[in-house]
């Protein structure tokens, strides 16, 4: 590589790092705007302990933590939905919402759209309730651990192997 290539590569690194820093700084600025609007720095906010942080500390396994995080993300989306008509904090909420969804779904748009579709389902709608009850067995089966199926397949393969060797 010649000097020009090194200089261009260095400039690209500087640009990417500074834009990442800028995005991060903008993100923190938007959170500070929300803290100011909701008066979240007031000492009485600490009454009763943290809302989510203790719960997050209790869960170590990635799959378990993801379940808890999905509920927390859902909470924030509902919170932002309640204030969607507030022009003072709209930009801050939109910025944080986009960043939160991007991070939570690892930039997967299909997972994101499915998640958003799920949290928009109206629980009080009779037709929705009927459909949900109709699908309950399949959902419960999907929630069941796969270990029994894996053990059964393993024992079947082991049995077949013994029979073939005789």
Swiss-Prot record:
Pfam families cross-referenced by the UniProt entry: IFN-gamma (PF00714)
Subcellular location: Secreted
UniProt GO cellular component terms: extracellular space
Keyword Glycoprotein set for record: yes
Biological processes per GO annotation: adaptive immune response; defense response to virus; humoral immune response; positive regulation of autophagy
Similarity section: Belongs to the type II (or gamma) interferon family.
Function: Type II interferon produced by immune cells such as T-cells and NK cells that plays crucial roles in antimicrobial, antiviral, and antitumor responses by activating effector immune cells and enhancing antigen presentation. Primarily signals through the JAK-STAT pathway after interaction with its receptor IFNGR1 to affect gene regulation. Upon IFNG binding, IFNGR1 intracellular domain opens out to allow association of downstream signaling components JAK2, JAK1 and STAT1, leading to STAT1 activation, nuclear translocation and transcription of IFNG-regulated genes.
Name used for this protein in its record: Interferon gamma
């Amino acid at each position: 590589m010649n000097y020009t290539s090194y200089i261009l590569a260095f400039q690209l690194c500087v640009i990417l790092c500074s834009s990442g820093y800028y995005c991060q700084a903008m993100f923190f600025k938007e959170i500070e705007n929300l803290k100011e609007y909701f008066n979240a720095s007031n000492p009485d906010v600490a009454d009763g302990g943290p809302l989510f942080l203790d719960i997050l500390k209790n869960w170590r396994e990635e799959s378990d933590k993801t379940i808890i995080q999905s509920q927390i993300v859902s909470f924030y989306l509902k919170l932002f939905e309640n204030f969607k008509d507030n022009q003072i904090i709209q930009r801050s909420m939109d910025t944080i919402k986009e960043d939160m969804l991007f991070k939570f779904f690892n930039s997967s748009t299909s997972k994101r759209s499915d998640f958003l579709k799920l949290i928009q389902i109206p629980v009080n709608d009779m037709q929705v309730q009927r459909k949900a009850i109709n699908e309950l067995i399949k959902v419960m089966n999907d929630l069941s651990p796969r270990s029994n199926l894996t053990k059964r397949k393993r024992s079947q393969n082991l049995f077949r192997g013994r029979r073939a060797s005789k």
